[in-house]
Amino acid sequence: MANTLYDRTIAFAGMCQAVALVQQIARNGHCDQDAFETSIKAILNTNPANTLDVFGNESQLKLGLECLVKGIDSTPTGSEVTRYLISLMALERKLMGRNDAMSQLGDRIQMVQRQTEHYDLFEEQMISNVASIYLDVISPIGPRIQVTGTPTVLQQTSNQHKVRALLLSGIRSAVLWRQVGGRRRHLIFGRKKMVEQAQILLARM
């Protein structure tokens, strides 16, 4: 993995995309399906050729790049995005310090990879299996991420599964972000450069 601005922007957009999708589901009970599929597939891509390969291509990160450019601001929605991002980074840091959890995470992801040989990854049961990895491996590490949205929507089991699966995808991108040199300080001091890079990528779509 190269430690370039491009790589950090791609990894950060992956985090942003997972967060934007969590917001969509938590509020409305549905989300951009193409972006959702990209984010969930990224969890299972554990041996990528490069940073972009985790997600496929740049256009598959359009929602995340747009969130990076326009979504992180002082509005209530923007503040929520920032809160989710900081929470994901904090969880990733705790995860990295726990060899037992990392080993368990790897085993559980491999199990889902094997299941995809027989089942569609986007069947409800498979999304539930991905969500259970977050619930069993990531949640106990803490701190818990408080998801805000429409209560009646969040009470639906299928939406809870999608949200947890997306939070796991956010962790996947947070791990990638650290691998390519991303640090929490970049959220404050390096974001302008990432926004400029994201704008270039969006302009050529």
From Swiss-Prot:
SUPFAM superfamilies: YcfC-like. It is found in: Cytoplasm; Cell inner membrane. GO terms for cellular component: cytoplasm; plasma membrane. Its main location: cytoplasm. This is High frequency lysogenization protein HflD homolog. It is a peripheral membrane protein. Keywords: Cell inner membrane, Cell membrane, Cytoplasm, Membrane. It comes from the Bacteria. Belongs to the HflD family.
